[in-house]
UniProtKB/Swiss-Prot annotation:
Cofactor annotation comment: Binds 2 heme b groups non-covalently.
Binding site for a ubiquinone: H201
SUPFAM superfamilies: a domain/subunit of cytochrome bc1 complex (Ubiquinol-cytochrome c reductase), Transmembrane di-heme cytochromes
Example GO molecular function: ubiquinol-cytochrome-c reductase activity
GO biological process: mitochondrial electron transport, ubiquinol to cytochrome c
Gene expressing this chain: MT-CYB
Record's protein name: Cytochrome b
Positions that bind heme b b566: H97, H196
Residues holding heme b b562: H83, H182
One GO cellular component, as annotated: respiratory chain complex III
More info: Heme 1 (or BL or b562) is low-potential and absorbs at about 562 nm, and heme 2 (or BH or b566) is high-potential and absorbs at about 566 nm.
Lineage: Eukaryota, Metazoa, Chordata, Craniata, Vertebrata
Family from the record: Belongs to the cytochrome b family.
Localization per record: Mitochondrion inner membrane
Cofactor: heme b
Amino acid sequence: MINFRKTLPLLKIINHSFIDLPTPSNISAWWNFGSLLGMCLIIQILTGLFLAMHYTSDTLTAFTSVAHICRDVNYGWLLRNLHANGASMFFMCLFLHIGRGIYYGSYLYKETWNIGVILLLAVMATAFVGYVLPWGQMSFWGATVITNLLSAIPYIGPTLAEWVWGGYAVDKATLTRFFAFHFILPFIVTALAIVHLLFLHETGSNNPSGINPNADKIPFHPYYTIKDALGFMLLLSVLLLLTLFSPDSLGDPDNFSPANPLNTPPHIKPEWYFLFAYAILRSIPNKLGGVLALLASILILLIIPLLHTANQRSMMFRPISQTLFWILTANLITLTWIGGQPVEQPFIIIGQLASMLYFLLILVLMPLAGLLENYMLKPEW
């Protein structure tokens, strides 16, 4: 009998990617987040598609169209809350996925890592333009503050900001184009995710030990399909618990008020997943400096492969690097907390110290720890 799975061109690609794929036998639950991100993306595209059928991207009706979805559309409240909280789950998985990559040295697959950083930027752009669409107070003022940062770019800045706005301020033209961007970007993200997977399958997966796993590999199906299925169920359970019991806990109360350009909210802040970058932006008392620090806080991921000094790939057997990694994690949580606080003491100084420590850890301390651990591995030590 002909095995179509191995002969038909399209099925052959799927077979080599998800069924007969040779996978290291020792990869842990930290390797589940790639598939969980794929599931999050599918959930976001499906719920977003149904929301787009009822949403209107006009300043006069955007807010009421979202209210209409929640009140009058069959299960509209569920679609909207799944979409909003699905974004939070997406970023939670994204941060854990990146953290895993840093801890286990997966960034040494440079092509996969660089595509991943581009993916992160694309997902962040998607989430930002999406947050503007309900046209609540925080949507409007968040869009105003963040797009205004473009005007800090020397010479072309003010023109660039007006070009993005489609006028002299955030208005109808901005909302319409942001809806268009929010519709197209997830499909670009999907294409990038396929390229990400393509580059990963050129080298094969990394594993917790960081050593070459070619001597001990097992087929992806059934071992890791069942493991991924468990991850799917756990993530869906958390998402549904959040959506059904506490759907607004991660949102901002100001977004329940329609956008009003004449009334500025007391504390303008983005969604929780951007707060760490927002804290770094605010910690520098200069507009252009803040924008550069904001960009650097994300783009620093691109140079992490160049800063790898250790002889071992993974941090599994490197206690000093492990300690610094968890300090970095705590530092990012601190930055997230600071980003949600008002601009006053002691939050200003804490934010500035945490921002300095963030760059110091990645650029100086972690590479030095790698060199020290190399020295400690020598027999004379």
